[in-house]
Every structure is written in C-alpha cells, then in structure tokens.
Swiss-Prot record:
UniProt-annotated location(s): Cell membrane
Keywords: Cell membrane, Hydrogen ion transport, Ion transport, Membrane, Transport
Native organism taxonomy: Archaea, Methanobacteriati, Methanobacteriota, Stenosarchaea group, Methanomicrobia
GO BP, sorted A to Z: proton transmembrane transport
pH-dependent activity: Optimum pH is 5.2 for ATP hydrolysis.
Note: This organism has both a Na(+)-translocating F1F0 ATP synthase and this H(+)-translocating A1A0 ATP synthase.
GO cellular component: plasma membrane
Protein name: A-type ATP synthase subunit G
Assembly with partners or alone: Has multiple subunits, A(3), B(3), C, D, E, F, G, I and K(x); there may be a few other subunits as well.
Superkingdom field: Archaea
Topology of this chain in the membrane: Peripheral membrane protein
Primary role: Component of the A-type ATP synthase that produces ATP from ADP in the presence of a proton gradient across the membrane.
Length: 55
C-alpha cells in the first residue's frame, strides 16, 4: 500500500503558489491584456462588418 506523507501534491502546491499576491498580480495583468486584445479584435470585426472597405 502507498504510504501517506504530508507533502503537498502538485495541485496543492500550484494553488498555494497562485495565492501569493505577486502571482495574483501577474495573473491579473495577463487577464487584463487578454481582455483588451479581445476588445480591440471585436472592434476591428465590427468595423470590418459595417464598412468592408475601411481597412
């Protein structure tokens, strides 16, 4: 049978690492940049749909 040890597994370590403020700030920056990029792409799609000769 497998022994029970108190070392955290990979998932637990990842969750603890993501809980650190520095990593949360980095995740927020990445999420913000992705959302900004999606918004810009959306505007381009809307403009291209309304006026196909724009770009």
């Amino acid at each position: 049978m497998a022994e029970c040890d108190d070392r955290p597994n990979l998932v637990e370590r990842a969750v603890m690492k993501l809980g650190e403020p520095k990593n949360q700030a980095r995740l927020l920056q990445v999420a913000w940049r992705i959302s900004l990029l999606m918004m810009v792409i959306g505007f381009i799609i809307i403009i291209k749909t309304i006026s196909p000769n724009f770009m």
